[in-house]
């Protein structure tokens, strides 16, 4: 059977020598790429069918009905896809072309679901008679219509940022096992011990490279900020599960603890001072603080809603509605600061509970997509900061060497100056020359003495002629002695 698509019903193709070649031979030699393209499309279709079959069954291929909800299945699919694509992104380098293509292709499959998440909106339609009639038409949901294009743009910015490091030669990476010999295995104590070590030139990065890296970091920081905002907004719109509410204590003070509750409920509250005063040295402590604050916020919100509904709280409380709103604002401010200070912090108990119990497919897609972009942006920022930190370390070493060299040069200059002065004045004057002494012939024999010893000896010789013998001193008579010689006349009898 032949294919006659080229020229009517002809089964042959003409050649320049007048001979004819069967069409199937041309297909075998001239279109291998076409066959490969068809095979790729067929394999893509098979992969997509398998992927969506798992999603429809909730990852339960047995069909027993024990699978996850569609929302959670989509959320997990996006999370697993991002882990497989970006999990090995340990260096500042472009993604492999195949990896990038697979990421965009499979994300396109998963995001195609949102085309069917619509809402009814009123519209006007002109009839045949020229009159307008109000009808209801479908439109993509507002949150998806706004946030999905924004997330796609953030996705493209992050991939372009990685592509910008394609031809850079200002820094490079060394495996950790090579550093092990130099540091005697101390690198395993580092929290990121699995990452390769960044190396920069011995004189550090150039000023141009440093500015370029800082610009890349600022760009990624904007992406991180936008993705975090979208993720936080979507999570705030999700319903709080009942099983999470049942696990909460009766009041926010019990959830926070005495110290945190007293700090948040004081009259004067400074969030910056409060966060700086806390012990946030480990990831576990940060996550524990986040869980406590979120639990107290849920408790306060429920009490406020119950008080507005019934006029009083079912749990009973002496705290006014206005103060509870103020406490909630303060707690939310602390949460925002924690997310900004620790962008890679794990999900809290409330967030995990919301994601697991969520049944809105659109919210599940928005939350998971923004979360994986937030994680990728945080990872890229951390890799850029590693390069800048390596450069700062080299700069500090150079400054220390320069200071040491300047001190040694100053000491050597001082020593050379002393030598020059000593060479110019060979006959140095002694202490006796400055005082004005003149050595006589009698004292020249003592020239071997030191100046201080000679000084004391001369002073003793000066004092000797001034001391006269006691015999040479004139006898002194006191006034009382004179009176003693003048006695009263004795009686003459």
From Swiss-Prot:
It holds the Pfam family PRONE. Residues 35-401 form the PRONE domain. Residues 1-45, 400-423 are annotated as: Disordered. One of its GO terms (cellular component) is apical plasma membrane. PROSITE patterns: PRONE. Keywords: Guanine-nucleotide releasing factor. Residues 17-27 have a biased composition (Basic and acidic residues). The keyword Acetylation does not apply. InterPro entries: PRONE_dom, RopGEF. GO terms for molecular function: guanyl-nucleotide exchange factor activity. Guanine-nucleotide exchange factor (GEF) that acts as an activator of Rop (Rho of plants) GTPases by promoting the exchange of GDP for GTP. The PRONE (plant-specific Rop nucleotide exchanger) domain is responsible for the GEF activity. This is Rop guanine nucleotide exchange factor 10. It comes from Arabidopsis thaliana.
